[in-house]
């Protein structure tokens, strides 16, 4: 409780925080201390999310690709059934009324512009009002990265204009601007 008054809340992030079976107890303890609780998740374990959602104040939900394209989604995540797990988690969050943002870390080799726009249209159709586009960047200090650097031309100015028009709250996070 030494931090009370210094902190407004605690955000559970990771990796993927929902893989930790201790997460529900940790969230309850933080909530019992009077802090707001945020969660960063890709939604890969809907059952654990469902258990803690009543205690969560805000969710940053990572969406990797259009969830309607399960093959692409699974390829981007490297895990089978990840699109269906994401969709289940997305529906749980929507139904809960908890504030959330959807965000995508994008690289043109995995999410070409046409797929990025397909994803954005899906989010729009689902009523998402806050979308953050995070352009992939190499990890700081990394000597090797599995992906080449992303140029400032991704996404195009036209695509950027569409994205800004789709969402009341559109955020672009990148290092080259």
Question: What name fits each language-model region?
Answer:
Residues 1-9, 18-145:
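Conserved AdoMet/S-adenosylmethionine-binding subsite of the radical SAM
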Residues 15:
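Conserved phosphoryl-transfer catalytic core
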Residues 144-154:
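Short, flexible active-site recognition loops that position polar ligands and cofactors
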